[in-house]
């Protein structure tokens, strides 16, 4: 069941990010109808007539353009990193007097590797479990996020549908690749 929930989170995240970026830049990418797009033309024929372009360059990309890392965008008193750890870990133990916000330890069933990983907050141990942007921020930048407002980019960077707690090594290997990496 947990694996199903993680996969649904990934799929929902991809859909949400696609909609946000697509709707935000859609008007800039609108194509004027050509003479060969008649009422009787099929969707396939219309799509076949469109020019396919590659992604934009990373020119100007900086992580800071997506706002403060792990902001409390939902204003629940808990930063996004701890929100995701609370959602994705089991057997969670919290730091005292943090209103069940700051995760001290827990268990992760990694959706990427299938491994079970013990999480313990600490300077040398927290990297075992990292939070992955399923659609990496630099990838989103190249696919239209550079046209979003600062507020929308911060929301995108902290969108729980685009975030998963994962094994640190798997996250490092994926790096800023796209969701298919």
Task: Tell what function each PLM region has.
Residues 1-31:
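Secretory targeting and sorting signals
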């Amino acid at each position: 069941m947990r694996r199903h929930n993680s996969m649904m989170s990934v799929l929902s995240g991809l859909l949400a990010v696609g909609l946000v970026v697509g709707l935000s830049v859609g008007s800039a990418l609108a194509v004027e109808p050509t003479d060969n797009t008649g009422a009787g033309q099929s969707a396939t024929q219309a799509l076949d007539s469109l020019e396919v372009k590659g992604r934009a360059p990373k020119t100007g990309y900086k992580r800071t353009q997506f706002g403060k890392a792990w902001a409390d965008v939902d204003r629940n008193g808990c930063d996004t990193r701890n929100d995701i750890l609370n959602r994705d870990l089991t057997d969670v133990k919290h730091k005292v007097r943090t209103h069940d916000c700051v995760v001290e330890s827990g268990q992760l069933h990694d959706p990427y590797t299938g491994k079970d990983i013990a999480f313990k907050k600490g300077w040398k141990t927290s990297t075992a479990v990292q939070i992955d942007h399923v659609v990496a921020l630099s990838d989103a930048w190249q696919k239209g996020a550079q046209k979003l407002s600062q507020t929308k980019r911060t929301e995108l960077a902290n969108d729980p549908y685009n975030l998963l707690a994962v094994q640190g090594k798997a996250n490092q290997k994926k790096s800023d690749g796209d969701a298919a990496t």
